[in-house]
Amino acid sequence: MLTSGFLFSGSRSLFLEGLKNSFLDYRAVEVDGYLRENIKLWDKRSDITTEVNQKGAFVPEDKVEAFISLFSSFVGTLDTVVLSGRVPEGVRRDIYRILIERANEKGVKCILDGEGDLLLSGLEARPFLIKPNEYEFISAFAPKDGSLEEIAKRAKEIVRSGMTTMVSVTLGRRGALLTD
């Protein structure tokens, strides 16, 4: 397995320490600054989760282009690529589309777990599977009433359109919906 992305110099030792005893290889483009931190606060009584997401460091365009080049250099050696999460400030909003296109050129399956414009842009490149959570799916694809039946119907429409082979919508404690 391989992990790749931006390695922020201020968080370098933390990242490398985490990888030390893992089976993961990594290839990264180093960027000045610190990795953003995300904190989730869960109130057990009300069952409400509050997210506090920091911005993190800005990634200059030359580093983004260096990452696209790095990704292109190794993607053909992989069977499957997972592209997930938000991207740092400065990273172009069509980054997932570009990376999926590069992977598709090499016959590599892509799983896209993104939200908003990152998800919609990535979908243009026809990933093998998209995996938004319920909120992300409803926000991006606006099923009529947000019911499980409407989510399933809209997911099937997306697959039938040829934009992706499979859609998996995670539903928190209720599990997940998977359609092909």
Please annotate each region the language model reported.
Residues 94-180:
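Conserved phosphate/ATP/ADP-binding segment of small-molecule kinases
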Residues 55-57, 86-89, 136, 173-174:
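Short glycine-rich anion-binding loops that position phosphate/pyrophosphate groups of nucleotides
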Residues 75-90:
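Short acidic, glycine-rich surface-loop motifs adjacent to enzyme active sites
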Residues 29-47:
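Glycine-rich nucleotide/cofactor/substrate-binding loop typically near the N-terminus or early
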Residues 1-35:
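Substrate-binding N-lobe of the ribokinase-like
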Residues 6, 30-31, 42, 53, ...:
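Short beta-strand segments
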